[in-house]
């Protein structure tokens, strides 16, 4: 079994929907899935409620209410204070191997890689010990250009191709973890 850690502040809703569908479909392989955000995410909350209900349903006639309440989803949503790196710090605190993370945040990816996790960004690129330094340097350089007014803050939008690339990379990584750890 393995865990998944999701920086859900920056993960687009279509991406979260894909991840949630796969987690619910193949939940038997997952120890825990952790979403960290500075706000309640209705889609994640609904997935937790739905999953908990589906786990309890077959046991309603055999267990009393107290025992049923102990049965809960292994999907967790952490609401952290709004502020710099609060969701990041929570994910780093929770992180454990074997596991992988999903984030757009390059400094967070670097911290998670140091803890032994594989990281996937929201465009479907796998970040590793081998490539994170270059990505971090590029990010820091672009940040300094933005701060000094040389470059305006523009991010490429998510088109269907980008969403498909993420979906394919997520499925491949998930399948790799199932083969390796389950």
What positions do the PLM features span?
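Nuclease catalytic cores that cleave nucleic-acid phosphodiester bonds
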Residues: 2-182
């Amino acid at each position: 079994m393995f865990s998944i850690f999701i920086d859900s502040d920056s993960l687009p809703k279509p991406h979260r929907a894909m991840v949630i569908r796969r987690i619910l479909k193949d939940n038997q392989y997952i120890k825990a899935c952790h979403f960290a955000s500075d706000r309640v995410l209705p889609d994640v909350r609904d997935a937790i409620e739905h999953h908990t209900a589906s786990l309890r349903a077959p046991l309603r006639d055999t267990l009393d209410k107290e025992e049923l309440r102990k049965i809960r989803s292994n999907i967790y949503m952490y609401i952290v204070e709004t502020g710099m790196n609060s969701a990041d710090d929570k994910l780093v605190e929770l992180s454990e191997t074997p596991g992988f993370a999903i984030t757009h945040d390059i400094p967070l990816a670097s911290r998670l890689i140091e803890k032994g996790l594989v990281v996937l960004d929201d465009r479907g690129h796998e970040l590793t010990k081998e490539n994170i330094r270059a990505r971090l340097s590029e990010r820091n350089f672009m940040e300094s250009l933005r701060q000094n007014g040389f470059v305006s803050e523009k991010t490429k939008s998510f088109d269907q191709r980008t969403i498909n690339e993420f979906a394919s990379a997520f499925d491949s990584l998930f399948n790799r973890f199932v083969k390796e750890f389950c």
